[in-house]
């Protein structure tokens, strides 16, 4: 009888990526098939996030539900991973002793051995260590699910912003070797992936080792990925302004596959608050990056992260943030009310902004950005937009849906052979959360750039050393 795996994932795209790798890994090693129904599962995994308020309590609340399943099925294996697991470690088992496995983001590749230990009679396994890049060497080959894919290029962060737990939960910055990244992306391209989103807590800090002992910069990696035939749309997230260097901006000038959309977190428009946050840049320096980008990509659209109500934030500080939002003209944002994260420097600061003030500021900020986004959408009316077709529309199964390079959903009448390909759409209607249009050009008529086939990259990168690690032979 086939055994089942259920994974519940909270948090960022990196967590989503990690969960997909866990599923592939345990399918390969234990034949565990994914199920959406926890009651059917033989293994339950909770991949946690510690960014939001009361993250720990949310974890234990979920585990309380799973406790009942464990009572009904004592052989059920329960594991907790992700950033809360990394933070809490053994404490998770002291509050929830029915949890069998606690693992961190850097030890998920050891799950097969951990499960075997539990099934072999061991009472519990806790491993929240930071074995650097080892996990990528032990994960299965990538498996495409549709025309878009996420690829992790690095882990961790060295910036130690005063409000952030990432350096403590995912460790310091470690970059994957460039050959490993290219090999994974070429394999995905062979399976029909057309858009790749490069992932990391701070992707523009990427410094990947090369086969000859050199270092590949993030700008160089972008060009290498874009040169793989089939990868005709390239994104990355998330970046830090202090490492958004001119060589990255140059890639926007000469690499058409890199989308005209950038997520660049700023958090605040007040230099005083930015200093308290230990962001190590000013609002003016942030605007300088945007100005340089718009010089080479006039139509580029920018999204960002904002924290409102940071300790000590005054009305003037918030007004500075609102001014920055207007000046940059952000298209979208991920914006949140500040809440202290245990163990961070900001947690020791007096949280002196009232809850009512925080809510009001968040409302005003989101309203401003939503209005700006609506203006961008209305400006698309009558224009042609290149869309990557993802599949049937959720609104009408007789239609297709896809996304523009600025991540707007477009619904249109099309044929099944368009799925997984690009089409140019003339926008005829603009709605609150989507666009509608008509096909004016199919992929065969576009003349997309061809540099090197995925198979060429695969053949070139499948040079393994004595540890079984491939090396890019450029």
From Swiss-Prot:
Binding site for [4Fe-4S] cluster 1: 12, 49, 83
Domain MTTase N-terminal: 3-120
Keyword terms of this UniProt record: 4Fe-4S, Cytoplasm, Iron, Iron-sulfur, Metal-binding, S-adenosyl-L-methionine, Transferase, tRNA processing
Annotated binding of [4Fe-4S] cluster 2, by residue: 157, 161, 164
Main location: cytoplasm
PROSITE patterns: MTTASE_N, MTTASE_RADICAL, RADICAL_SAM, TRAM
GO CC terms in record: cytosol
Compartment list: Cytoplasm
An example molecular function term from Gene Ontology annotations: N6-isopentenyladenosine methylthiotransferase activity
Subunit structure of this chain's protein: Monomer.
Name used for this protein in its record: tRNA-2-methylthio-N(6)-dimethylallyladenosine synthase
Gene label: miaB
